Amino acid sequence: MQKGIIILGVSLLLTACDLGFPRMTVNYDNLPQGEIKEYITKRFPNEPEKEVLSKLIYAHLDGDNRADSIKKAVSQMGMTCEAGKEICEYSGYIRTKLTGHSSGSGRAKRIYHIVISPKKGMDSLAIEHQIIEDTEN
C-alpha cells in the first residue's frame, strides 16, 4: 500500500514538473534542401560557422578552386547560382515556437542568408544570421 502511494506521488510530481517547463518546437521546412540545410539543422540552435562551412565546401572542390568548381560545389550543396549574377546564395529560415513560458508570443524566425562570389573565391563566403519575432500564422 505504502509502495503504491510512493509510486503515485512520484508520478504526479513528474507530471506536474513536466507541465511547467518550456518546450520548443522547430520547423525546418523553409530551408532549401541540401548539405547546407543538414549542417544548419545539426548546429541548431547555434549559429553556423564560416570556417566549418568553408571546410564543407573545400571537401567538394578536390583542390580545384576555380570559379566554375566553386559554383558547381555550392550548387550541389543547396545554394542557388543564377545565370548573369556573380554570386551564389542560400536563403531560408527556421521557425520556432516556445510554449510553457510567460512573456511574448514565443514564436521566432531564424533567418539564414549565405552568399559566395565564385569569381572572388572562398574568401568571399559570408553568413548572415538574424532572429526576428514570427508574426505569421
What is the predicted role of each segment?
Residues Q2-L8:
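Sec-dependent signal peptide recognition
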Residues D123-N137:
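Short, low-complexity, Pro/Ser/Thr/Gly-rich segments in the mature regions of secreted, periplasmic
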Residues A67, K72-S117:
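A cross-family detector of function-defining hotspots
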